[in-house]
Amino acid sequence: MPGYTEYVLAEGSFSYGQAVAVITAYRNVFIQDDPGMHFRRVIRNAEGQRRWRCRNSEADAGKQLNAWLASGGLLRQ
């Protein structure tokens, strides 16, 4: 879709709203185990296999996610 660009998070923990912004921009990023405030962000490869996941509340969650998005994120077109 036109207008989608790379989305980069701050290096620390991230909010649900920030998570939604990322899953809107990338087609292989998902939210998992969503009981409310604490959830996991998951990146899958083209075959659907999990490549990475972390909890949104981890101290370096954004830093880890940014690195995985740079190497394996599939932007929506």
UniProtKB/Swiss-Prot annotation:
InterPro entries: DUF905, YkfF-like_sf. Transmembrane segments: none annotated. Coiled coil: none annotated. SUPFAM superfamilies: YcfA/nrd intein domain. Gene3D superfamilies: ykff protein like domains. Pfam families: DUF905. Belongs to the UPF0401 family. This is UPF0401 protein c3666. It comes from Escherichia coli O6:H1 (strain CFT073 / ATCC 700928 / UPEC).
